[in-house]
């Protein structure tokens, strides 16, 4: 997925799923906490939505807080993720 498409996907998650009224656009230098007012609980929600909506696998052991400092660092992190594989649960 191209970077611009990832940015648009994150914007859609923030505005539609997380219902952040203060977010109208994203710039790579925007800080998630200070500029977009995303707290730690919302960061966890964002990770879940990245997996569900963007279909990227976010391994718990690879989540680095530095990846969630700015929009740009989040996009860098997302570019490194693998596509989420459909898990077939047939017991």
Curated annotation (Swiss-Prot):
Q: Which NCBIfam families match?
A: PRK07639.1
Query: Where are the O-(pantetheine 4'-phosphoryl)serine modifications?
Result: 40
Q: Which SUPFAM superfamilies match?
A: ACP-like
Post-translational modification (record): Activated by the transfer of a 4'-phosphopantetheine group from CoA to Ser-40.
Annotated Carrier domain ranges read 4-82
Output this protein's name.
Acyl carrier protein AsbD
Which InterPro entries does the protein's record reference? Answer: ACP-like_sf (IPR036736), PP-bd_ACP (IPR009081)
Provide the taxonomic classification: Bacteria, Bacillati, Bacillota, Bacilli, Bacillales
What does the similarity note say? Belongs to the acyl carrier protein (ACP) family.
In its UniProt entry, the species of origin is given as: Bacillus anthracis
> Pathway listed for it?
Siderophore biosynthesis; petrobactin biosynthesis
Q: What does this protein do?
A: Involved in the biosynthesis of petrobactin, a catecholate siderophore that functions in both iron acquisition and virulence. Aryl-carrier protein that activates 3,4-dihydroxybenzoate (3,4-DHBA) prior to its incorporation into petrobactin.
Keywords per UniProt: Phosphopantetheine, Phosphoprotein
Q: Describe the disruption phenotype.
A: The deletion mutant cannot produce petrobactin on iron-depleted medium. In vitro analysis show that mutants grow to a very limited extent as vegetative cells in iron-depleted medium but are not able to outgrow from spores under the same culture conditions.
């Amino acid at each position: 997925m191209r970077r611009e498409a990832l940015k648009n996907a994150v914007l859609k998650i923030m505005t539609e799923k997380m219902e952040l009224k203060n977010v109208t656009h994203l710039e790579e230098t925007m800080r998630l906490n200070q500029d977009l007012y995303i707290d730690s609980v919302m960061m966890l929600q964002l990770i879940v939505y990245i997996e569900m909506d963007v279909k990227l696998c976010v391994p718990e052991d690879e989540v680095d807080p530095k990846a969630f400092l700015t929009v740009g660092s989040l996009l860098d992190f997302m570019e490194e993720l693998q596509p989420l594989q459909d898990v077939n649960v047939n017991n």
